[in-house]
C-alpha cells in the first residue's frame, strides 16, 4: 500500500507455508532452516540472488547470531541500496566500517538499537539524540539515519530533520517493522535517499495519527490507513 513494485521475502523454509497462504502480494525465496532460523545456507542463497533485486532490507524477525552478521556483511559489500533494522543493526556494528560504502544505506534504529550499533550508552543517546544522530551522519556520509524516539531524528551528512509527531501507539511492537517496509517502498520510488526517509517517516506517523485511540491502536492499522492519507508535498524540509 506504500507503492512498492514487487517484493520477495527470503525466509526459513519452516515458515514458508504459513507465509504463502497469508498473502498473495509477495514472492518467497525459501532457505533451509536450522531450529527455526536461517541455516548457514542462507549466506550462499543471498549471494546467488542478490543481483535480482534493487533494494535489500535485512533484520526484521532475525536474531543476534553469526548468520545474521554474515548476511549483513554480504549485503553491505554489494552495490545495492540497503535498509537495516532490528538485529541487523547489532550485526552491522561487528564490521561498522562497511557503512562507509558508496551506495545508500538507511538505518532505522530505536534508542536501544542505536546503542547496539554505536556502543554509545542508552542514557547518553536519550539525553542527546540530536547530537548523536548528527555526529553519526557525519561519520557515515552515505548513510541516512532514522533514529526513533518520542521524536524522530532523520540525519544525513550532518543535517538533522526532526519529526515531532508524538503518538503513544507507535511504541507498540511491530510499528517499527512497518516503518522499515515503508522506507523500502519509498527508496524504490525516490531517487534521493534522504527524501525517501523523510517521506517514509511522514507517511508512517500520519497514518498512525488517523487512529486517535492509542490504547486500541494496532500496528496493522498504519498499513490500512495509508490509502486514506492526504499527503503534503515535502520539497525542502526545515533543517536544524
What are these regions, as identified by a protein language model?
Residues 236-240:
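Short "domain-exit" segments at the C-terminal end of structured domains
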Residues 1-81, 90-106, 111-235:
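Small-residue (G/A/S/T)-rich helix-start motifs and N-terminal tracts that mark the onset
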Amino acid at each position: 500500500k506504500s507503492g512498492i513494485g514487487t517484493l520477495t521475502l527470503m525466509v526459513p523454509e519452516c515458515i514458508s507455508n504459513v507465509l504463502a497462504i497469508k498473502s498473495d502480494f509477495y514472492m518467497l525465496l525459501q532457505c533451509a532452516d536450522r531450529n527455526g532460523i536461517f541455516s548457514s545456507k542462507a549466506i550462499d542463497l543471498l549471494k546467488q540472488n542478490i543481483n535480482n533485486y534493487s533494494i535489500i532490507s535485512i533484520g526484521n524477525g532475525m536474531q543476534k547470531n553469526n548468520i545474521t552478521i554474515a548476511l549483513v556483511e554480504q549485503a553491505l559489500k554489494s552495490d545495492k541500496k540497503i535498509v537495516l533494522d532490528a538485529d541487523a543493526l547489532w550485526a552491522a556494528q561487528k564490521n561498522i566500517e562497511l557503512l562507509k560504502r558508496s551506495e545508500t544505506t538507511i538505518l532505522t534504529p530505536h534508542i536501544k538499537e542505536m546503542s547496539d550499533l554505536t556502543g554509545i550508552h542508552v542514557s547518553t543517546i536519550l539525553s542527546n539524540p540530536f547530537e548523536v544522530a548528527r555526529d553519526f551522519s557525519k561519520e557515515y556520509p552515505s548513510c541516512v539515519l532514522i533514529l526513533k524516539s518520542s521524536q524522530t531524528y532523520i540525519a544525513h551528512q550532518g543535517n538533522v530533520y526532526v519529526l515531532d509527531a508524538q503518538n503513544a501507539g507507535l511504541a507498540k511492537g511491530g510499528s517499527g517493522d512497518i516503518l522499515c517496509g515503508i522506507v523500502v517502498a519509498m527508496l524504490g520510488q525516490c531517487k534521493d535517499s534522504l527524501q525517501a526517509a523523510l517521506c517514509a517517516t511522514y507517511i508512517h506517523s500520519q497514518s498512525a495519527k488517523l487512529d486517535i485511540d492509542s490504547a486500541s491502536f494496532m500496528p496493522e492499522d498504519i498499513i490500512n490507513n495509508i490509502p486514506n492519507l492526504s499527503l503534503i508535498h515535502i520539497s525542502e524540509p526545515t533543517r536544524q
